[in-house]
């Protein structure tokens, strides 16, 4: 590999007057190659343009140009091999150079600090995952408690409905009017519904009003029922005395 300026000038001499590399380095070698390729391309384009301008000498000039291109390409390949050798040597030298001791110690300290931080981050992530798992468990417990509360409320509402219905049965034994029975959800009947205090009140209800009452008490019925709906509603609110059961209900008004 050339080392002196004269050797470099001799090896990289060219007809394009491109300055040879000033030193045996990949930087200078690549600089020379780029300049050489650019100038060669310019000359090639100019030559081809001249060929096109002179059709009579086209074939001869084209042959000459092709030969020149072949020779120049071979020189480019030779230059490239030399630059590749320089690059490989530089890489080899850099791999053999050991950094100063203080630099190695700094890098080791940086690596230890980075490992410590990464370990801390991993611990933090595990803690977060544990907390998330605990929160999920708590959420599941709260959901279960909420479901239990809803079930308990439904049971209380059902007991309340049954309790009032039982009181109404006792009232009917003495021929008293009954009290309003809350729906199965714990709410009182809608205010726009006529109150029920006797079987006569049930008999005066429309089909829509009777359906709303039965749905509120959770009583199933068929849409085509008439008198059967009224009897079910009377039983649902505690109108179950003998004279209530024998009451002759009429159909729904049209």
From Swiss-Prot:
Family classification: Belongs to the UPF0612 family.
CC annotations in GO: cytoplasm
Keyword terms of this UniProt record: Coiled coil, Meiosis
Protein name: Meiotic expression up-regulated protein 23
Pfam families xref list: Mug135_C
Gene Ontology terms: biological process: meiotic cell cycle
InterPro entries assigned: Mug135-like_C
Coiled-coil annotated spans: 41-86
Biological source species: Schizosaccharomyces pombe (strain 972 / ATCC 24843)
Residue ranges, annotated region (Disordered): 1-30
